[in-house]
Amino acid sequence: MHDYVIWVREVPGVSRAWAWDAWHGPGTVGLAWLYDDRENIVPTREDLKTMEQYLFCHKHPATGVMVGKPGGIEVWPVQVRLKKVSISIRLTPDSLANRSAVRANLTALQKTLAPGQTLPVSSLRTAIGMTSGITDYFLNIGEDTTSDVDELITIGEVTWLTA
């Protein structure tokens, strides 16, 4: 599985990748990847074609030797569905700088998540509470957020509450 993740990450623009063994039974691999620097981070049809060609056969970046998926292995691209979690936050003290810093921490947190992973409310609280300058906050979410195996939790709209 590790080779597939490495190969996918070698393709320009790919920022995150995951692989699952026996996705549709023996001899199959499920493969998902994202492009975090794009507005729409999910692969397009063209991205899927490019990836299929790259996985079939490409030059190893360090050695120049041709490598690719072994014969008999069927790779299934997994189209990750984004599960946006919208949240409401009230910060003390409330400022544009604090809001930007909290948003940056939430973005960093979402990039640690994998498809099918649960987002613990404690992780949201840590991302907010560890922001320098924040002395208190309110968060409207009180429970962990779960996802299906092909869903990836992302931070959706943040509503900034005022006192």
Please place each PLM-identified region on the residue numbering.
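Carbohydrate-recognition loop of C-type lectin domains
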Residues: 1-119
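An aromatic-glycine-centered, glycine-rich loop/turn in mixed alpha/beta architecture
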Residues: 98-163
